[in-house]
């Protein structure tokens, strides 16, 4: 904002907002504007969630998601007005027909292949807390398995908070987009993150298996492999493998690894749709 005159920065790192700016802001900061900003902000959170767990979804599904939060049970017409206004300000998604599509999957009509993989599965509808969490972090920071991984990265590998957050997002991105453990280990290697002992590797493997099985995936329209397996067991009908491929890496104990046939990864390595992870420059450059 400083280059537009909204903030004045001084050489001693002190900054202040000019009185003229404060005066104008007080004039335009009406209850109506605040309400509009609330609705646009919540819509952006819902779009972020849609991109993270579906990539493409019917507008009616996103509408259901939007209305779950108290105070946002708007009509479908108002929902579309908010969505279209956000599209003018922030082009994260586009409306095509009766569907909302994350822009990252428009290239080469990738969204069509994603829909083909998803098949006729139902859409998982996230809770309000999940939507807010994913929109803020780009991954499920409150999930038990991800918290275990966070503790491991912090306590065992002695990583700082910013680096831990970066890696947790990368882990979610890879697993949710059909990636494998080898993809994640490659990202670790790029950042010169190494394991000090076999004991660390032995602890790491089951944590990653648990994280994988509790990750909401595009192929499953937001459901986790564990949830898909539970439904399959209830129906007693065989389904496609509900867990991603784990490739033994070095001294990883293979008895702790889910051993599935690998699938070709079809999803792009695009930045997190919530935008909060763009500070991770190496990831945003993918």
Predicted regions and their residues:
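Conserved small/polar residues in nucleotide/adenosyl-binding loops
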Residues: 280-285
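Extended alpha-helical interaction scaffolds used for oligomerization/partner binding
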Residues: 121-253
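Accessory beta->alpha helical hairpin/"wing" motif in late/C-terminal subdomains of nucleic-acid enzymes
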Residues: 3-30, 96-107
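Short acidic, hydrophobic short linear motifs in intrinsically disordered regions
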Residues: 57-66
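Positively charged, polyanion-binding regions of nucleic-acid-associated proteins
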Residues: 39-56
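Short Cys/His-rich zinc-binding micro-motifs
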Residues: 268-278
